[in-house]
């Protein structure tokens, strides 16, 4: 069986646990996924299983990809992703459902693309404190980065100095999130806390 699933973030909600605590959860539409390709060590150089999720119209898919999906016997999929760790019982065209892979109270990793926040300064982007308090004399540089390097020596700015720039929109992994509930009839999984990305963002759910 595959070591993960492709899902789509639906939104957030809250549920009550057995002790009456209100638990904030993210609802993810997890599958069903279809095995669109099985890679082997001998043929491809590494072992992996490729899963497809979310149907797409044939007119929006290239001829090469249409042939790829025909081999698996499934309609074209919008999202494809590979998972490396899996068992030997996976065949081309198999359907993988959320209840086949995950259990409640299990810990999983979630990978997605974080929300893009545009061009941001160092305070928001890196958590800088600014250059000092106004009571110490400065009056117009509260959110500035301060010095970015020395002067004559080395006469340049070192690589990796944290500055303002494009924030968010990066592939991000959140680890050790707890599975609160599995709704098999709705192909949904409730995950404790938040996961990367906006609503309708595709995410990968990885087993630990």
Swiss-Prot record:
InterPro entries found in the cross-reference section: Ribosomal_uL3, Ribosomal_uL3_bac/org-type, Ribosomal_uL3_CS, Transl_B-barrel_sf
UniProt entry keywords in alphabetical sequence: Ribonucleoprotein, Ribosomal protein, RNA-binding, rRNA-binding
Pfam families (alphabetical): Ribosomal_L3
GO molecular function, one term: structural constituent of ribosome
GO CC annotation: cytosolic large ribosomal subunit
Single biological process term from Gene Ontology: translation
Record flagged with keyword Zinc: no
Keyword RNA-binding on entry: yes
Functional description taken from the UniProt entry: One of the primary rRNA binding proteins, it binds directly near the 3'-end of the 23S rRNA, where it nucleates assembly of the 50S subunit.
Protein name: Large ribosomal subunit protein uL3
Lineage: Bacteria, Pseudomonadati, Rhodothermota, Rhodothermia, Rhodothermales
């Amino acid at each position: 069986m595959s070591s993960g699933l492709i899902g789509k973030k639906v939104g957030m909600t809250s549920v009550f646990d057995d002790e009456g605590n209100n638990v904030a959860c993210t609802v993810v539409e997890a599958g069903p996924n279809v095995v669109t390709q099985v890679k082997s060590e001998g043929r491809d150089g590494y072992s992996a299983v490729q899963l497809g999720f979310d149907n797409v119209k044939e007119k929006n898919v290239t001829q090469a990809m249409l042939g790829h999906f025909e081999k698996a016997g499934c309609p074209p999929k919008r999202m494809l992703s590979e998972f490396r760790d899996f068992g030997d019982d996976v065949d081309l065209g198999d359907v993988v459902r959320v209840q086949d892979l995950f259990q409640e109270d299990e810990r999983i990793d979630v990978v997605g693309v974080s929300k893009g926040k545009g061009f941001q300064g160092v305070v928001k982007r890196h958590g800088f404190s600014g250059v000092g308090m106004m009571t110490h004399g400065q009056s117009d540089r509260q959110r500035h980065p301060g010095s970015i390097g020395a002067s004559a020596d080395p006469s340049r700015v070192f690589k990796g100095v944290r500055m303002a720039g494009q924030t968010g929109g990066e592939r991000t992994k959140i680890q050790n999130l707890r599975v609160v509930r599995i709704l098999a009839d709705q192909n949904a999984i409730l995950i404790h806390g938040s996961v990367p990305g906006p609503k309708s963002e595709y995410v990968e759910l990885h087993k630990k």
